[in-house]
Amino acid sequence: MNILIYRYNSICEDAVIRGLKELGHTVYEVILEVENKSPSGQEILDAVVMGMEKSNADIIFSINYYPALSEIARVYKLLYYSWIVDAPVLELYSKTIKNRCNRVFIFDSELYREISVYNPYNIFYLPLASDCDFYQKAIRHASLADVEKYTHNISFVGSLYTEKCPYDKVKNLSPKISGYLHGIMKAQEKIYGYYFVEELLSDELVDEFVKNYDGYYLAGEEDLLTKKRTLAQFYIGNKITAMERVDTFKYLSEKFEVDIYTASDTKEIPKLKNHGTIMTHTQMPIVFNKSTINLNPTSKPIRSGIPLRIFDLLACEGFVLCNYQSDLLNEFLPGEELDIYSSIEELEEKIRYYLSHTDVCREIAHNGHEKVSKYHTYPLRLEQMFRLGEHRRR
C-alpha cells in the first residue's frame, strides 16, 4: 500500500515507519506538525491533500487520533488508521470518532471499552510494540565509557510530571473542595488496576473547578467529552501521576541510591541523583540495558494498558519493575519476563530482593526480551492492525 503518515514527532513514529517499510509498504511523510506545533486546520488540510496527491495514498495513518485527518479521509473516501499510544487523548471524544472511515487502535483495554461504543465496527484494542533491532544496535555500539557512565543499580528515565501538571493552575477553590480532591487523589495514588476518580466527582464540584480555572479545556458542542471526564482524566490524572512519582522517588531515595534522567525539577528530593536528560535513541537504551533495575511507574491516565516504555525497556533487554496494570497479565508473566508491584512497600521489598539477586534480574530481562522479539515487534503488530482493519466495513 501507499501510506501517508502524518507526523508530530512521537517517539515511536520512526519505528512504525521502519515496520511499514519492512512489510513492503511505501510511506510518504507529512512533517508539518514536526516543524509547527500549532498548525491551523487549513494548513493541515493543504499539507495532507498535497501529500495524498504526491503519494497516491491508499490510507492515511497517524500516531494518536486527529479529527482533521478523519474528516479529510471521510471526504476523500480513504481509510484513516490511528494508533493510540498515549493517555489521555482527548481528541478521541471528537464527534468525528463515529466516522466509518476510521480504523482506531487503542493500547488500553479500559479506554477501548469506553470509546468503542461510539464506533463498534471500527475501533479495536491493540497493544503497542518493540523495536528490538534498533535498540540492540545502539547497545552494541556503546563505548566502554558510556557503558560505565550509564550503569546503575536502580534507574528511571522520564518526567516526574511536576512541570506539566495543568491541575496546578486552578485558583481559589474552596477549602472543602480542595481538601476533597486531595483526598481522592491520595487514595487513587495507592490503587493500581482501577481508576475511580470520575465516579467521585459531583456536577457541582466540576462546575466550581471549571469556574476557577482560566482556560479550562472545553469540547465542542457535538463532541462526546464531558467536563467531568476532562477533569478526571486530564487535570486530576496528570496531577496524581506527579504526586505518585515524587512520593515514590522521595521514599526510595531515602533507602537506596536511585539514578534518574529527567528535565523535571528534583530539588524536593535531594538524595535523588538527577543526571538531566539523555538522547532517546542512543543513550537511553544503554541505561535500560545496563541498569540492574529499571523502574516504570505508569502514568495514571493509562488505566489498564501497557505503556510504550515497557516495550522499549524489554527491547533493550532491561529488567523492568513496574506497577500492576491489568493488560500486562495478558502479554507477560510477572516474575519471569518482568515484575510488578502493587504498593510502595512491595516495591521496596522487591528492590531489596533483586539487588541481592542480580542473576535473577538478568534472567528475567533475557526472557522478557525473547518474548517481545518473538511476539511484539512492529512488523507483527502492524500486520495484526491491517488484518483487523481490512475485515471491517467503511
Please describe what each predicted stretch is:
Residues 2-12, 121-122, 127-302, 325-328:
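Nucleotide-sugar donor-binding catalytic core of glycosyltransferases
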Residues 3-6, 50-65:
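Short N-terminal targeting/anchoring amphipathic segment
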Residues 4-7, 11-14, 18-23, 28-37, ...:
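Catalytic binding pocket for nucleotide-activated donors in carbohydrate/polymer assembly enzymes
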Residues 6-10, 62-66, 85-86, 106-109, ...:
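Structural motif
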Residues 35-51:
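N-terminal beta-loop-helix "entrance" segment that forms/cooperates
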Residues 47, 69, 92-93, 282-283, ...:
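Short acidic active-site motifs
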Residues 52-58, 68-80:
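Glycosyltransferases and closely related glycan-assembly transferases
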Residues 73-88, 103-106, 125-128, 155:
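Active-site proximal beta-strand in glycosyltransferases
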